[in-house]
Amino acid sequence: MESLSLIFISFITLIVFLVVSASKKRSHPSGYEPDIPKGGCPMLDSTAYLVLSSPTNTAVTSTGIITSNPENIEHVLKTNFANYPKGEHLTYGLYDLLGRGIFNSDGDHWKLQRKIASLEFNTRTIRHFVTHDVSREVLDRLLPSLSRAANSGEIIDLQEVLDRLAFDNVCKIAFDDDPARLADKKFNDGENDYYGKFAKAFGEAAEISTQRFEKSRWKIARALNLGTERKMKNALAIVNEFAMQVVREMKRKRAEEGKGRGSSADLLSLFISEGEFSDEFLRDVVISFVLAGRDTTSSTMAFFFWQVSTRPSICQKIKEEIVSVRKNHNNSQGGAFTLEELREMDYLHAVLSETLRLYPIVPLHARYTLADDVLPDGTMVKKGSTVMHSIYAMGRMESIWGADCLEFRPERWLENGVFRPKSPFLFPVFLAGPRMCLGKETAYMQMKAVAASVMEKFKIEVADGKHESEREYYLEIVLRLKGGLPVRVTEKEWSDNSAVNV
């Protein structure tokens, strides 16, 4: 989850950088000319072109420094970590929404929240979350939803379905609540839909928060309650009321159960049991972890299904692995996967990692510089500068991934059929160093549970007829498929052999 700490900052810094860059004529170095295809996300591709055109994979711009050099990234995220916080000037615009939550704070305030949150992400908690909460959501809601789509023949937006699944899951692990948004058979949000109103308001508040970095006069607009700041005020009212209601309800439950954490195994109850925190502090906890899990896994899964649905050979190998794992555990009945079964799915793990390599959910990160510094590649960094690192560009570097770096090839992650991870400084999708993602394993297990369950029973076909090169994606808090992912679902009866039929 910590990998999302600069998600808003990254997006806006990128936009500002590109606007400035576009207003000036730039000449690229005469050396390496990266073969990055047009389309996809022009902003990200333009930025990647800039840093990959540099011999050191670092570019100095009018808005700061942007790099995809692994040594530089290790320096910023680990070696000289103390010199590169988020910084108040990068977090102020996000304060109305995020407060001083873990993803919008530095120093002791951040350390305290990370220390408490780290207690949640242990093997016992992951096992319960995956085998109980995620499995129930998949078996009782996701698979029936896909079955209805298969039986009716309707085309559904799989990205929307996955969004609802992720929202239900994050509410469970963050504050032990079940919105049941995936249970709505028609996926309609009525005017009285409490959770639907919050989800919509949260999205609006997040979008406007990012736009603030583009508008020099947003503070005046906020004071006068004008334009998007009026919309922001209304959205925040809904978001804050939701979060405070969650806090009040959790405190009520805790009072009934007595001192200690009680029966809940969620993040909010953990924070309440660990100290006497104000309601405002706990409100920031709720919002921060909704941010962390709201669209992240769902968007990654949308990119995953887009990629495998257009690659029958990869789809076949995943299904063969599912059959093999089932047999190894003498499980011929289907149903929920155990944590042990999911951990044995090396090829599926490789496909998910390959998805994240080419389509990192947080494609850029940014840091503020406290004191003058020199990066390992010799780049001078002045105090007060912003240093961005492009995860998107790193996934397209021949020096890391080879000449076929633009190809979707999961086998690059395997050695004799066993998954072999890369250094987090070569693959910083989950960040690295002291702020490395706490929920990395949880995210992988959750995604594997969803992917394996769906692919074991269904065939997913992209239904809009777009060629892969025509598929557009964009930044909206996280990397998203533009227009969603319209798919046609075909259901198959499960058996030892049927799972290998594409």
Curated annotation (Swiss-Prot):
GO molecular function: heme binding; iron ion binding; monooxygenase activity; oxidoreductase activity, acting on paired donors, with incorporation or reduction of molecular oxygen
Pathway given in the UniProt record: Steroid metabolism; cholesterol metabolism
Pfam family, one: p450
Residues reported to bind heme: C437
UniProt keyword list: Cholesterol metabolism, Iron, Lipid biosynthesis, Lipid metabolism, Membrane, Metal-binding, Oxidoreductase, Steroid biosynthesis, Steroid metabolism, Sterol metabolism, Transmembrane, Transmembrane helix
Segments traversing the membrane: 3-23
Cysteines paired by S-S bonds: none
EC number: 1.14.14.-
Tissue expression summary: Mainly expressed in leaves and, at low levels, in roots, fruits and stems.
GO cellular component terms, semicolon-separated: membrane
Membership in a protein family: Belongs to the cytochrome P450 family.
Function: Involved in the biosynthesis of spiroketal steroid and saponin natural products from cholesterol such as diosgenin and analogs (e.g. furostanol and spirostanol), plant defense compounds used as main precursors for the industrial production of steroid hormones. During the 5,6-spiroketalization of cholesterol, may catalyze the 27-monohydroxylation of furostanol-type steroid to an intermediate product that undergoes a stereospecific formation of the terminal heterocycle to yield diosgenin.
Protein name in UniProt: Cytochrome P450 CYP94D109
Lineage of source species: Eukaryota, Viridiplantae, Streptophyta, Embryophyta, Tracheophyta
Gene for this chain: CYP94D109
